[in-house]
Amino acid sequence: MAGEAEALATTAPLAPVTSQRKVRNDLEETLPKPYMARALAAPDTEHPNGTEGHDSKGMSVMQQHVAFFDQNDDGIVYPWETYKGFRDLGFNPISSIFWTLLINLAFSYVTLPSWVPSPLLPVYIDNIHKAKHGSDSSTYDTEGRYVPVNLENIFSKYALTVKDKLSFKEVWNVTEGNRMAIDPFGWLSNKVEWILLYILAKDEDGFLSKEAVRGCFDGSLFEQIAKERANSRKQD
């Protein structure tokens, strides 16, 4: 019969990968119930109540992630709104068109309220949980809630150079480590999403911080960057 130490072990001697990709066992010291999926907020060990001042507007965390691109707050993100969002984030026109086509083509149909495709490629925020794909970090659950422990595990497993920060190589390792068998759409989507986030939010030393990743999950990162850019333009 296994003792308490073995029952709570997070590494297995015959599975070296469990030692290479460590998970934390101290999260409850600073984050209540880190295993419990949160519907409205995206907390971590430094922000146990989520993003201060960020209004969920009653949306799930996954819906909040997308809502930045909904320019007129009608619950639908059309390609021209996605394009405007990317421009507000600082992407040039060509890359904004590219990312817009990729995102709306990939996620429009699965979020539609009917089986009939729409040539306008709208993404319906109400149904964004249906756009969850495989080979991701599982920080969103299948209903669009946010699971704090899985955010923390990303960084305990892969942030080996600087605590709570990912280099580009480590971002790549995240996408490789999350790969599931026979899931090419998930492999590609996961890599595109993480590389896009790295391009958007890496710091001057080339690292992607846990705070930036957390802000991406609840959309507050997008709001912050767009606001900073708008203020900068006013000062010019």
UniProtKB/Swiss-Prot annotation:
Its main location: membrane. The modification Phosphoserine is found at S220. InterPro entries: Caleosin-related. Disruption phenotype: Increased drought and salt stress sensitivity. Delayed seed germination and reduced cotyledon opening and greening in presence of abscisic acid. Belongs to the caleosin family. The N-terminus is facing into the microsomal vesicles. This is Probable peroxygenase 3. The lineage of its organism: Eukaryota, Viridiplantae, Streptophyta, Embryophyta, Tracheophyta.
